[in-house]
């Protein structure tokens, strides 16, 4: 008897190709499932989720597979969006994609999979592992690997997950979609945070977190060099949006004092204070047993390179990470993912002092 795989379909080309490949294999009963988390409207006033669902319908009809829809909008606001706002208001820079994977896609969606009597959940993530019992590994396409965004998802939650695109390059996915005549073959990839869309980040955030004007201070001279509309709008290492003129070198955000509402900057992209040799990580999730010390590499943001490091577990359940060489713009609230080669060991949330000491 063939087993049933529930494909998380977003209306994009990746999940469309996942459904196509699984149907073509002939080993599974393939069922599509569209998940609505946010009711964002596009520039024409049309809900983007409605447009995406229409694309899911078109693909499901092309492939002759049944499909369902489920709304997690309420839960998404409670478990992802509310925390996103709270963290930003407190000066942190959270990663909502990591939260969404842990709280929604591989928790609530998994419950829906069980309701539909599914044996497997398949997604369009560019990573490997899951149902093969190996935990989590990078996808082979280095430009699309998404293991970073899954590093906070418990191993058990991935135990029945199929990642058909983990061994495929994005260019090949497009080619497969075009040769199969899939309706989404030329659809643009979605980018950015789903609930922000194409709007400037500041104009979005100011709808929920009030402006709080304050000083921008040059950390080296301790002189006021500008004004800001709210320290929560800025993240460590940020260059754009400071609106500071008359400097010989570009300015970068060094740190923030949320109590005094001060943003500190330094001049020059290679200023030594922009680099840190160590960090603490909390809210940890491991795919392998933690050894002491663990010699590995770490990514402190999605597009950053791997940095060699040593990881030391602490008594309070956090870990201290010491890098072989200092790393630029380590940001509190962001996600750190740990690797040995292509294997993702786990991940956590970065905790570093927000204020540099004089």
From Swiss-Prot:
It is found in: Cytoplasm. The record marks 125, 334 as: Interaction with tRNA. Disulfide bonds join 100-194. Residues 144-146, 301-302 are annotated as: Interaction with tRNA. InterPro entries: MnmA-like, MnmA-like_C, MnmA-like_central, MnmA-like_central_sf, Rossmann-like_a/b/a_fold. Its main location: cytoplasm. Residues 95-97 are annotated as: Interaction with target base in tRNA. It catalyses: S-sulfanyl-L-cysteinyl-[protein] + uridine(34) in tRNA + AH2 + ATP = 2-thiouridine(34) in tRNA + L-cysteinyl-[protein] + A + AMP + diphosphate + H(+). Pfam families: tRNA_Me_trans, tRNA_Me_trans_C, tRNA_Me_trans_M. One of its GO terms (cellular component) is cytoplasm. CDD domains: MnmA_TRMU-like. ATP binds at residues 8-15, 35, 124. The active site is at residues 100, 194. GO terms for biological process: tRNA wobble position uridine thiolation. GO terms for molecular function: ATP binding; tRNA binding; tRNA-uridine 2-sulfurtransferase activity. Gene3D superfamilies: Adenine nucleotide alpha hydrolases-like domains (2.30.30.280), HUPs (3.40.50.620), Translation factors (2.40.30.10). It comes from the Bacteria. Its EC number is 2.8.1.13. Belongs to the MnmA/TRMU family. HAMAP family: tRNA_thiouridyl_MnmA. Catalyzes the 2-thiolation of uridine at the wobble position (U34) of tRNA, leading to the formation of s(2)U34. This is tRNA-specific 2-thiouridylase MnmA. The gene is mnmA.
């Amino acid at each position: 008897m063939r087993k049933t795989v529930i494909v998380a379909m977003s209306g994009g080309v990746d999940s469309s190709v996942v459904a196509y490949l699984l149907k073509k294999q002939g080993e599974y009963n393939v069922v599509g499932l569209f998940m609505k988390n946010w009711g964002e409207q596009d520039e024409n006033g049309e809900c983007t989720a409605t447009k995406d669902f229409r694309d899911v319908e078109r693909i499901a009809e092309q492939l002759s597979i049944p499909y369902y829809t489920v709304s997690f909008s309420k839960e998404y606001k409670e478990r992802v969006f509310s925390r996103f706002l709270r963290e930003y208001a407190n000066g942190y820079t959270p990663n909502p994609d990591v939260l969404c994977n842990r709280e929604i896609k591989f928790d609530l969606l998994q419950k829906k999979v069980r309701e539909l009597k599914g044996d497997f959940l398949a997604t369009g993530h560019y990573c490997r592992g899951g149902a093969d019992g190996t935990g989590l590994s990078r996808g082979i396409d280095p430009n699309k690997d998404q293991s970073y965004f899954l590093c906070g998802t418990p191993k058990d939650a991935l135990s029945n997950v199929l990642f058909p695109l983990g061994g495929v390059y994005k260019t090949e996915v497009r080619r497969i979609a075009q040769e199969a005549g899939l309706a989404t073959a030329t659809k643009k990839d979605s980018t950015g945070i789903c609930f922000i869309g194409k709007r400037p980040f500041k104009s979005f955030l100011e709808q929920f977190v009030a402006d709080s004007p304050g000083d921008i201070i040059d950390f080296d001279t301790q002189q006021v060099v500008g004004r800001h509309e709210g320290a929560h709008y800025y993240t460590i290492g940020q260059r754009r949006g400071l609106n500071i003129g008359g400097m010989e070198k570009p300015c970068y955000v060094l740190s923030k004092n949320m109590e005094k509402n001060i943003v500190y900057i330094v001049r020059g992209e290679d200023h030594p204070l922009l680099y840190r040799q160590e960090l603490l990580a909390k809210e940890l999730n491991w795919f392998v047993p933690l050894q002491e010390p663990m010699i590995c590499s770490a990514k402190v943001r999605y597009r950053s390179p791997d940095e060699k490091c040593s990881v030391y577990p602490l008594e309070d359940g956090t870990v201290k990470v010491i890098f072989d060489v200092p790393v630029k713009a380590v940001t509190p609230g962001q996600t750190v993912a740990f690797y040995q080669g292509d294997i993702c060991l786990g991940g956590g949330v970065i905790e570093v002092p927000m204020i540099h000491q004089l």
